[in-house]
């Protein structure tokens, strides 16, 4: 993830964005795998038999059938069966769609949302952790900017809806989601979730918690951020203002983007955008 200074002084990215060809291959793969998962085993076997017959008819005994050839042939049959668009036609629609997906209002997000100001800083495959049902729309916006997004919520229905729309919008290639209780630090089996460039928190998940439990969960999320990582606290909960959480971020610095937006627009709710220290205070 680029710093604000890097964005101001250079438009050069450290990582190249995905090419349209890569996005097209992901589009095909998602549709093919979705179709395979939607049909029964018998139908899948019949599809395999059809692919084998087609290969044998066209090969004239020139090669031995292999698993790779069979899989490729099955995939081609599925592409034909689903009438998936060729690259040239797909690209025209994709460019328009992706341009729309990268705007906050496409997802019903306020243009003054604290995350919006950070979008120019996001690079392909930056890792983002989004926590809470009230932050669900942020998952789509981040995925549209090619971030690798992990979504956590304690509501199974919400997680399933996000997963479904990610697939519908062709944004699921770098997306993961988990259902977990958010009343304490994350469970041990989620210890692999760490090193995030960006964490987006719906403070609604902290509503009703004791001050001690609230602090434990926030500190746990802080530890999962890389040095210099960003935390965005959304103004999504009427019951819990983001500013109430500010004392839990001792040593973290407010980002300039939100300061400027606050000066430009004094009305309406504001969130918090905070940057983790690049080194512990005692070694600074």
Give the residues covered by each predicted segment.
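A short SAM/SAH-binding and catalytic strip from SAM-dependent methyltransferases
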Residues: 194-213
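Conserved class I S-adenosyl-L-methionine
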Residues: 124-134
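Conserved SAM-binding loop of SAM-dependent methyltransferases across substrates and taxa
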Residues: 135-147
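Conserved alpha-helix/loop element of class I SAM-dependent methyltransferases that forms part
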Residues: 106-125
């Amino acid at each position: 993830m680029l710093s604000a200074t890097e964005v101001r002084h250079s438009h050069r990215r450290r990582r190249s964005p995905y090419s349209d060809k890569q996005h097209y291959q992901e589009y095909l793969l998602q549709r093919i795998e979705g179709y395979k998962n939607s049909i029964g085993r018998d139908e899948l076997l019949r599809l395999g038999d059809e692919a084998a017959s087609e290969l044998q008819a066209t090969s004239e005994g020139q090669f031995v059938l292999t698993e790779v050839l069979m899989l490729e042939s099955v995939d081609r049959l599925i592409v034909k069966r689903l009438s998936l668009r060729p690259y040239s036609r797909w690209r025209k629609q994709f460019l328009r769609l992706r341009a729309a997906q990268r705007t906050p209002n496409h997802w019903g997000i306020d243009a003054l949302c604290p995350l919006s100001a950070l979008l120019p800083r996001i690079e392909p495959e930056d890792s983002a952790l989004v926590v809470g049902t009230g932050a669900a729309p942020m998952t789509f916006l981040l995925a549209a900017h090619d971030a690798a997004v992990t979504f956590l919520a304690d509501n199974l229905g919400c997680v399933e809806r996000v997963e479904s729309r990610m697939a519908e919008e062709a944004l699921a290639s770098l997306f993961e989601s988990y259902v977990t209780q958010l009343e304490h630090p994350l469970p041990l089996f989620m210890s692999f979730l760490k090193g995030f460039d960006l964490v987006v928190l719906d403070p609604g998940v902290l509503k009703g918690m004791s001050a001690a439990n609230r602090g434990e969960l926030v500190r746990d999320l802080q530890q999962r951020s890389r040095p210099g990582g960003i935390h965005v606290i959304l103004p999504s909960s009427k019951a819990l203002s983001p500013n109430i959480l500010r004392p839990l971020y001792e040593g973290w610095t407010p980002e300039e983007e939100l300061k400027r937006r606050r000066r430009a627009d004094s009305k309406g709710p504001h969130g918090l955008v905070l940057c983790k220290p690049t080194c512990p205070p005692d070694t600074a």
